[in-house]
Amino acid sequence: MTLLANSKRKPTLAHSGANGRLFMLELSGGRIHSMRPDGSERKVIVSNCRLPDGIVVDVAAGHIYWTNMGSSPSANDGSIERADIDGRNRKVIIPQGVTHTPKQIHLDKAGGKLYWSDREGMRVMRASLDGSNVETLVQTGQGDADARDQTKWCVGITIDPKCKQFYWTQKGPDNGGLGCICRANIDMPKGQTAANRSDIEVIFDDLPEPIDLELDLKNRVLYWTDRGDPPRGNTVNRAPIDVEPHLGDVPEIVLTHLMEGIGIALDVPRDRMFVADFAGSIYAARLDGSDKRDVLFAQGNLTGIAYADI
């Protein structure tokens, strides 16, 4: 179909589907895949990862960064690696023993930092892009007893550079309705620590099981996946961030019928999102959830996903 110059109708996602590139993690196979957003040119660029979960792309430097949860939650052998965008020159930048179970990860290119959530470590962490200067920003618990309390498990992470804040999810028990989304200032309050900082806000609570977070900085909207039970779980949700949070507010659901939704990536200039679920599907849709379509189906247990305009 040819769109006339004066047509007010939006093109469908298929018209811009091949722009950019997706990077996705296959947990079951321990692999990183790269492909066009329409599913073409798919290839494996990294193999032999130890339960990969979150991924980000630094286009300017030509790097990808990803988290490995490690051999098992009890082993405390998670790590973070870096490689070139084509998968070459792989390097461990956060070795085993520094972070317990690293989950989703966020790149703050301007600030020169990587942020990530550590599930069994019950913390939000960050480091310089070379893996140095590791810091703990939030510590929700300590010890084995706390580590069994899933309400303390940190999973998703994103930052708001404008307001100098970061957001994270605490997922709660599987399908438990005890998940929450929190935020705090990037700068630690003077005289306080990751375990006792007083600036933490809970902006949504009683969520089924929130996982990954992404911010649409242009429109000031927070998006997240939830892998809990329907009707509010197995969804993509969104909410504006520049309004005063009121616990009990119900966020807008924009996508439904996921099969344990995990990763989410936004391409705001082209009005589209990409979502990965644990049943092995990749979905594309507009930011309002319309024009949903399948990109991949039943391709292993998929976790993190990232979009790069390359």
Whereabouts are the PLM-identified features?
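An edge-strand/N-cap motif at the start of beta-rich repeat modules
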Residues: M1-V44, V57
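Beta-rich, blade/repeat-based domains predominating
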Residues: L3-N19, C49-G62, Q96-K113, Q142-Q165, ...
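Conserved loop/turn at the beginning of each blade in beta-propeller domains
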Residues: S28, D38, N48-R50, D86, ...
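Short glycine/acidic-enriched loop and turn motifs that connect beta-strands
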Residues: G29-G30, G70-S74, G121-R123, G172-G176, ...
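A short loop-to-beta-strand structural motif that recurs across blades of beta-propeller domains
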Residues: R31-H33, G78-E81, R123-R126, G179-C182, ...
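A short beta-strand motif characteristic of beta-propeller blades
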Residues: S40-V46, N89-P95, N133-R148, S198-F204, ...
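Short loop/turn segments immediately following beta-strands, especially the blade-tip
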Residues: S128-L129, A184-T193, A239-H246, L287
